Amino acid sequence: MERYESLFAQLKERKEGAFVPFVTLGDPGIEQSLKIIDTLIEAGADTLELGIPFSDPLADGPTIQNATLRAFAAGVTPAQCFEMLALIRQKHPTIPIGLLMYANLVFNKGIDEFYAQCEKVGVDSVLVADVPVEESAPFRQAALRHNVAPIFICPPNADDDLLRQIASYGRGYTYLLSRAGVTGAENRAALPLNHLVAKLKEYNAAPPLQGFGISAPDQVKAAIDAGAAGAISGSAIVKIIEQHINEPKKMLAALKAFVQPMKAATRS
């Protein structure tokens, strides 16, 4: 959890925002997935958001659903994902690692056991996409017991009550949603979210990272100009993996070429 705090402090000092890529663990196979993650970090990723393949990903659009299917086709299991996480942490000791997942995967292990395993492999945060704030107590309590930050989604239409709850229960960062709907680069991020950012700050929430529909450097810049601490890009990155599925070297080069200008856009 402390990795987020020290990262945001360092970025603030350097007058930068965070650029955060999302990929599904094990897409398109374990070996290439580890190379993809190394490439994202080398190209300038400040933190990682990683998905564990799940059979019914409700919040995800077709691009990320396909990533999940590719990981399943490669035979990737949650146990292997945790082995990958341990390897990533060993190689990259300081980068914050977040998981973005669904409640069933947490229940399968038992809630406490799941967060204990996260702590063991060096995961810093977990966002459970299908658990609303008001039902989050058993998840967030287990998370905090194991020094894992519980992450909450702040939708664009959040009312005052919800903003207060998110500020009170969330740690690490706040996932600020650009718009309603499912993930996807086709649907560009909507209006600047200045009013939400201001409210979250007022209630002392964890720093907001804007996600959903972030696929170009100008959107990263706009998110940071609106007061977000950074931006998360998922579908645009997963699309690059899809486009170069049969050319692993080209894939890594294309990912690097995408991430570098996205990171550059975080510098004021």
Swiss-Prot record:
Classification via InterPro entries: Aldolase_TIM, RibuloseP-bd_barrel, Trp_synthase_alpha_AS, Trp_synthase_suA
Gene assigned in the entry: trpA
Complex formation: Tetramer of two alpha and two beta chains.
One Pfam family recorded for the sequence: Trp_syntA
Gene Ontology CC terms, in alphabetical order: cytosol
Lineage: Bacteria, Pseudomonadati, Pseudomonadota, Gammaproteobacteria, Enterobacterales
Any one GO MF annotation of this record: tryptophan synthase activity
Pathway(s) the chain acts in: Amino-acid biosynthesis; L-tryptophan biosynthesis; L-tryptophan from chorismate: step 5/5
Family affiliation: Belongs to the TrpA family.
Keywords for the protein's UniProt record, in alphabetical order: Amino-acid biosynthesis, Aromatic amino acid biosynthesis, Lyase, Tryptophan biosynthesis
Annotated protein name in UniProt: Tryptophan synthase alpha chain
Catalysed conversion reaction: (1S,2R)-1-C-(indol-3-yl)glycerol 3-phosphate + L-serine = D-glyceraldehyde 3-phosphate + L-tryptophan + H2O
Enzyme Commission number(s) from the entry: 4.2.1.20
Residues annotated as the enzyme's active site: 49 (proton acceptor), 60 (proton acceptor)
Job of this protein: The alpha subunit is responsible for the aldol cleavage of indoleglycerol phosphate to indole and glyceraldehyde 3-phosphate.
